Amino acid sequence: GERVSHGVDALSGIPTYSLFEDMVFAGADEASTDKAYMPAPESLRDIDLLFFDMQDVGSRYFTYASTLFYTMRAVAAAGIPLVVADRPNPLGGEVVEGCRQDESCRSFIGLARVPIRHGLTLGELARYYNGAYGLGCDLTVIPMEGWERSMLWQDCGLPFVKPSPNLPTPASILVYNGTCMLAGT
């Protein structure tokens, strides 16, 4: 991926914070003992609501889903509502493949107990995280229109914007889903 840094919006002068710039180790005060990478508390100061609008790729080990999880944990602790803009799963929602993550192997690139190709949208993942992991996040998911579970990205009629420099085409997302299993070997 590419580095995404904090900055200031040129039009409004409002500070912007990258969810990847300063991931911090949440440490032993977390309810669980796993390592939790969350937005820095100072990046949440003066926020009334956090709007999460990122394109996931339908694969357990794509980091936007983990970023969503830890963002949900952070805003829940800070009492900040979260709004997630739901987007199509580029791999569709009918095919679910691969084993579920073993809890003893959790990491930032393998967080939730979902199959490798999970078939969920980011909004559905947010609801799953909130319920399955008891995050207590004040969550609103803005539903999308026109997407059906049988649709792959090319069926959506939407322009493709690469979610990562390493995923330049819809076909690369499908390949990523299978080849990332080799990354840890």
Summary of predicted features, one role per range:
Residues E2-I47, S59:
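Glycine-rich oxoanion-binding loops at beta->alpha junctions
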Residues F25-G27, G58-Y61, N89-V95, E148-L152:
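Short, well-ordered, mixed-charge alpha-helical segments that flank or form enzyme active sites
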Residues D48-V57, V83-D86:
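Short acidic catalytic loops
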Residues D56-L68:
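Glycine/threonine-rich flexible loop motifs
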Residues A77-P81:
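A short helix->loop->beta-strand "cap" motif at the edges of active sites that frequently abuts
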Residues V83-C105:
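Glycine-rich, charge-decorated loop segments at or immediately adjacent to ligand/cofactor-binding or catalytic sites
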Residues C105-T179:
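Conserved anion/nucleotide-ligand pocket segment
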Residues C180-T185:
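Hard-cation-handling environments
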